[in-house]
């Protein structure tokens, strides 16, 4: 009986030791730990592009253009957010590309490791964005499967390619 008790206590100790307070799967909805500024650190696309035409293609579009450098999200402790969406705007009739920006505001909620941010476009359409938290909440990742991102054809004319995009934001 004494051996069974010791074995049970050992199993219990191991099971408690296997849990860690920094597990990304923990239910960490602490608003204070989420609130803050997150800067875009990666804009990864399904296919590599050479948008800046330097001879080196990259799947991280931040290596191809400085147009994304100001993209950031501010999550506030009152469950509101502001998203500065710096991007590349392409005139599809001319193939000319320019840096552009748009700022949206809305509300956010958190469930486990997912932050859901919702805002309304000027035309009244509601948009929902889902960000997965990792790295102890310091990293947010958003994956989109069917979206557009900038590319160039063989003549160097800019166009919108359809594919997957994964953006990564890092808390400052």
List each language-model region with its residue ranges:
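C-terminal motif of bacterial Sec signal peptides marking the signal peptidase cleavage site
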Residues: 15-18
